[in-house]
Regions:
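Compositionally biased low-complexity segments at domain edges in trafficked proteins
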Residues: 30-35, 138-162
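C-terminal motif of bacterial Sec signal peptides marking the signal peptidase cleavage site
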Residues: 12-14
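Residues that cap or initiate secondary-structure elements
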Residues: 34-38, 51, 108, 120, ...
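One face of beta-strands
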Residues: 26-30, 114, 127
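Sec-dependent signal peptide recognition
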Residues: 2-8
Length: 162
């Protein structure tokens, strides 16, 4: 069963010429339809290098972990100082809008993937949104409305090996 879910992202991010080790905040505002809110337990955020070489349609079909190597992902950091190549954020109660802050390295040509994950154990993939980030600047960036998530339960494991 497929249900489109609108995932909204406001990008307020990181600068400059090419990718550097400097990471600056990327703000994400996520809104989820209340109709599917009870199914979603968390969002997993990942940013891929070489975004224009990626096919977002293909990346959204199944777990990102089954399609790319963890070395293709940028190192991210959340507002609490947790870091990793993927970051997980619990969904807001009742599907309420939520704001996230993720430090993304300054640079160009990225693909941002947000996976909706179940609250079950083990965690299962529900669907994802993929968006191209042409440039992450040091100032305020234009707001991005993310591609809708098509909820399609898959049997893949969304966890990247560490």
């Amino acid at each position: 069963m497929r249900r489109p879910t609108l995932l909204m992202l406001a990008l307020l991010a990181g600068c400059g010429p090419d990718a550097t080790s400097e990471a600056l905040p990327l703000g994400l505002d996520i809104t989820l339809s209340r109709a599917v809110a009870s199914q979603v337990g968390a969002y997993q955020v990942a940013v891929l290098k070489d975004g224009t070489k990626r096919n977002c349609t293909e990346l959204q079909r199944t777990c990102l972990s089954s399609q790319v190597s963890s070395s293709d992902l940028l190192e991210l950091k959340d507002a609490d100082g947790n870091s990793g190549r993927t970051l997980r954020f619990p969904s807001a109660p009742g599907g309420a809008a939520m704001g996230l802050s993720v430090d993304v390295p300054v640079g160009r040509d990225y693909a941002l993937v947000i996976e909706a994950l179940t609250a079950d154990t083990p965690t299962r993939f529900l669907g994802s949104s993929c968006n191209y980030l042409r440039v992450v600047n040091s100032g305020t960036n234009a707001t991005l409305v993310a591609a809708p998530i098509e909820l399609t339960t898959q049997s893949c494991d969304p966890v990247f090996s560490r």
